[in-house]
């Protein structure tokens, strides 16, 4: 794993969060390099600057390295991005007091002079971010967005034009391009909230823009709902909760239980919390955490059931370390006799990991694509 970042005279040591020494994944990509290189070569840096979708702090550390006093507004939806950026600033002895933190639901300041941004995988979320920028940026403000060259096409440039202003792409460098968009100064309204029902469980659901499965029940969640465990559960964790549909259903099945919703996405946690209220579930039984797995879950929470639909992507990277951390955290936090109940794609072979960690693993259900697995802490 490479940890030494070097571009246009900026030297940094950067690690992903959480640090995975055995991983071959690094904390930045060529798009980060291209964006920072373009900024330095153009000599058009401006303050205050907003940095959006900075995976682990390569951009904010790079800009701070150039001038530690520059005020930076850092926006992220991912808790791991927030924690990774903090750690990488400390690792490179860069100040944190010049950073102002924002989630993707917060309103950015109106005096921004420049925006540096990575293109997210979810284009609905990207449109939401551009729309929010349109509400605060004066006409003429530059927004620089870096992405893989293969992701940039006419349809993407149309998204810029629709939600913020005209845009053009640079020449390719290391298979990436930097798009320059100039705000037209016209504020756009945010998209209306979309709600949908899961009639077989009498649930009404809505998702914010960066939450998986925008307006329907995804296949993995559906098979999970059809195969929830039976028992007398008092403390349940919906780990990687997304819109919270699994936790909502368990609240119906186990009305005496406390349900703890955890996700790396702030929008997911906000969606789960809104859906809890929307479905008129008891306010004192739902608990919500924006966190990296169960890293900061209060010690007094000792679940007897953990439900989990692990992601196998972190941004653009395909990785199983998130699932592995979820399983490790579940084993650490479950009560003796407690159950980890998961759904996953068959090809991911999660049964091997569960057998290794728990010394037991049962196949509860399966179809051509998904498998439901259960392991018990003994």
UniProtKB/Swiss-Prot annotation:
GO terms for cellular component: cytoplasm. It holds the Pfam family MTS. GO terms for molecular function: 23S rRNA (guanine(1835)-N(2))-methyltransferase activity; nucleic acid binding. InterPro entries: DNA_methylase_N6_adenine_CS, rRNA_m2G-MeTrfase_RlmG, RsmC/RlmG, SAM-dependent_MTases_sf, Small_mtfrase_dom. Its EC number is 2.1.1.174. It catalyses: guanosine(1835) in 23S rRNA + S-adenosyl-L-methionine = N(2)-methylguanosine(1835) in 23S rRNA + S-adenosyl-L-homocysteine + H(+). It is found in: Cytoplasm. Keywords: Cytoplasm, Methyltransferase, rRNA processing, S-adenosyl-L-methionine, Transferase. It is an enzyme of class 2 (transferase). Belongs to the methyltransferase superfamily. RlmG family. Specifically methylates the guanine in position 1835 (m2G1835) of 23S rRNA. This is Ribosomal RNA large subunit methyltransferase G.
């Amino acid at each position: 794993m490479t940890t030494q970042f070097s571009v246009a005279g900026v030297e940094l040591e950067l690690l992903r969060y959480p640090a995975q020494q055995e991983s071959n994944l690094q904390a930045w990509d060529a798009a980060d390099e291209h964006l920072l290189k373009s900024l330095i070569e153009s000599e058009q840096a401006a303050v205050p600057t907003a940095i959006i979708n900075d995976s682990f702090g390569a951009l904010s550390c790079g800009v701070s390295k150039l001038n530690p006093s520059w005020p930076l507004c850092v926006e992220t939806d991912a808790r791991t991005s927030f924690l990774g950026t903090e750690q990488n600033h400390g690792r490179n002895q860069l100040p944190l007091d010049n950073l102002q933190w924002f989630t993707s639901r917060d309103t950015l300041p109106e005096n921004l002079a420049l925006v540096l941004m990575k293109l997210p995988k979810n284009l609905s979320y990207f449109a939401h971010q551009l729309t929010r920028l349109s509400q605060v940026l004066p006409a003429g403000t530059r927004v620089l967005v870096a992405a893989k060259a293969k992701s940039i096409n006419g349809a993407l440039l149309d998204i810029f034009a629709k939600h913020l202003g005209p845009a053009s792409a640079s020449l390719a460098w290391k298979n990436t391009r930097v798009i320059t968009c100039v705000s037209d100064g016209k504020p756009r309204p945010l998209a209306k909230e979309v709600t949908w029902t899961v009639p077989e469980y009498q649930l009404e659901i809505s998702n914010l823009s960066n939450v998986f499965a925008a307006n329907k029940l995804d296949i993995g969640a559906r098979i999970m709902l059809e195969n929830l465990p039976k028992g007398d559960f008092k403390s349940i964790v919906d780990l990687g909760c997304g819109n919270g549909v699994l936790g909502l259903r368990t609240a119906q099945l186990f009305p005496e239980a406390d349900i703890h919703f955890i996700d790396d996405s702030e929008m997911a946690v906000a969606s789960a919390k809104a859906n809890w209220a929307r479905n008129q579930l008891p306010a004192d039984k739902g608990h919500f955490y924006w966190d990296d797995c169960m890293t900061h879950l209060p010690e007094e929470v000792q679940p007897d059931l953990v439900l989990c639909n692990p992601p196998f992507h972190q941004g653009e990277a395909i990785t199983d370390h998130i699932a592995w951390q979820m399983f490790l955290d579940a084993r650490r936090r479950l009560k003796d006799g407690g159950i980890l109940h998961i759904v996953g794609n068959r090809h991911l072979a999660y049964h091997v990991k569960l057998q290794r960690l728990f010394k037991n693993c049962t196949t509860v259900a399966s179809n051509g694509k998904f498998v439901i697995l259960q392991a018990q802490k003994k």
